[in-house]
């Protein structure tokens, strides 16, 4: 039986997530939230109604592994453990939070964290995304991740998901709300403008 001082117990197996939109990424530098341990982390926004059969299999494998580590660690299944409302699980409905990109009740999100090692990030051509080109990986883009599942009872009790490595899959609108100058002006080219020589002194 796990005791109140037992550290988090991670599984050794790695699983692959379905595609998700990236939210709150801290993958190039560690960040601390609410005074907690600094760690590399991000939140994935998943849309199960859009899953392919392969995506569903990956999703089910993650849920199954969470159930297995819960049973192994606490000797009880997740359903039983959830009778204690303080028991933490990683999955949350999209309408539980009021952030940009959230609000959809059909969306499910969970956070992934790794306090020790910066995740490796690749693009679809298997080229690395590093701190030097970090703008390529941003809140709002699509990615997938390798993860592991673990149970913990050091600070509260629950099951959670650890972050392995990441692959960016595609671009999308940034959750930060910023656009590039090319996006702003590229669809409306300037033709025949030479700068002009009008007297603008009346605008001073």
Give names to the regions the model predicted.
Residues 1-16, 173-204:
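Acidic, gly/ser/pro-rich intrinsically disordered tails
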Residues 46-50, 149-151, 170:
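Beta-strand elements of well-folded, non-transmembrane domains
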Residues 98-127:
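Catalytic core of the SET domain in histone-lysine N-methyltransferases
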């Amino acid at each position: 039986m796990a005791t109140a001082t037992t550290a988090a117990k991670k599984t050794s197996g790695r699983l692959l997530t379905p595609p998700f939109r990236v939210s709150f990424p801290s993958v190039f530098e560690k960040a601390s939230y609410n005074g907690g341990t600094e760690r590399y982390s991000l939140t994935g926004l998943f849309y199960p109604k859009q899953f392919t059969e392969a995506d569903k299999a990956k999703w089910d494998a993650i849920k199954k592994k969470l159930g297995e580590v819960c049973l192994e660690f606490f000797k009880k299944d997740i359903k039983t453990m959830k009778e204690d409302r303080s028991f933490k699980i990683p999955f949350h409905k999209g309408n539980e939070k009021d952030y940009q990109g959230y609000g959809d009740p059909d969306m499910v999100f969970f956070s992934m964290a790794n306090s020790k090692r910066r995740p490796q990030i690749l693009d679809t051509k298997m080229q690395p995304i590093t701190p030097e080109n970090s703008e390529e990986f941003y809140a709002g883009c699509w990615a997938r991740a390798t993860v592991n599942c673990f149970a913990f009872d050091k600070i509260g009790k629950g099951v959670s998901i650890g972050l392995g490595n990441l692959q960016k899959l595609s671009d999308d609108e940034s959750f930060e709300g910023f656009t590039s100058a090319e996006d702003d002006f590229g669809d409306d080219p300037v033709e025949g403008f030479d700068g002009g020589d009008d007297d603008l002194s009346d605008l001073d």
